[in-house]
């Protein structure tokens, strides 16, 4: 099982976040992930560095660790703009990027306050949000395709298309993501965690390299293959554990995970 780290880029000054990313690379984490939020309010922070700006800065500060977003809300950016941004990040990072995407929330809810404040249009029906996610995936793939439409000549295109992973909380989206993308991610305490992942894997046709990942809170011991939680995930077919450090990153704690990774 690959062990990754996710940081909250609203939790600390950039210098501390940069050092945490470097520490994660030195410790042997597979990838470093961040959030796609415009405001730090949800995390009790007074600010939030923008998702792709900070991931690009980590790309410049590191050389080998994978990089990813968990997850990019597909309502936050027009698909063509997202394709351009991701192509740029993939080039700058040396093909280390994975695009994690999510369908987002309904309008006028606690989870949509940022988008409501910025007058970003949202879709009330979950089925429509799932359709939007599938549409975005299709647009990305068409812009990145070797035989893309002539209207996209001159638009940046990654030499290696980044994997696309979908954050899922429902069986409908798990199955759809399994068929359309390169992986899924769900939360560690989802009551249907194992079944969601199994549904996505089945929908993928048990495709080689399909990424079935789970995020949890940052607990260094979870990286230990002998830890009961680690073994529980492995038994469910989890290929990647992404540990999320919600608060200001503790560089020493991050470094301590090296004992389980090397």
What is the role of each PLM region?
Residues 1-262:
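Active-site-adjacent structural elements that line small-molecule/cofactor binding pockets in enzymes
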């Amino acid at each position: 099982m690959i062990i990754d780290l996710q940081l909250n880029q609203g939790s600390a000054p950039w210098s501390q976040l940069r050092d945490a990313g470097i520490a994660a690379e030195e410790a042997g984490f597979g990838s470093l992930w961040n959030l796609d939020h415009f405001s730090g309010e949800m995390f009790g922070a007074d600010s939030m560095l923008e998702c792709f700006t900070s991931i690009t800065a980590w790309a410049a500060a590191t050389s080998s660790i994978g990089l990813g977003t968990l997850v990019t809300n597909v309502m936050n950016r027009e698909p063509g703009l997202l394709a351009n941004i991701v192509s740029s990040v993939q080039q700058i990072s040396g093909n280390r990027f994975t695009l994690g995407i999510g369908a987002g929330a309904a309008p006028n809810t606690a989870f949509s306050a940022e988008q409501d404040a910025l007058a970003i249009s949202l879709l009330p029906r979950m089925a429509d949000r799932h359709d939007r996610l599938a549409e975005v995936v299709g647009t990305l793939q068409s812009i990145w395709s070797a035989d893309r439409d002539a209207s996209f000549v001159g638009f940046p295109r990654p030499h290696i298309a980044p994997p696309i992973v979908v954050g899922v909380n429902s069986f409908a989206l798990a199955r759809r993501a399994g068929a359309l993308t390169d992986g899924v991610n769900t939360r560690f305490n989802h009551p249907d965690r194992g079944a969601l992942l199994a549904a996505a894997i089945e929908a993928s046709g048990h495709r080689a390299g399909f990424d079935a990942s789970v995020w949890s809170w940052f607990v260094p011991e979870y990286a230990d293959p002998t830890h009961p939680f680690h073994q529980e995930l492995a038994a469910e077919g989890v290929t990647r554990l992404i540990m999320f450090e919600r608060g200001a990153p503790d560089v020493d704690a991050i470094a301590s995970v090296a004992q389980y990774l090397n």
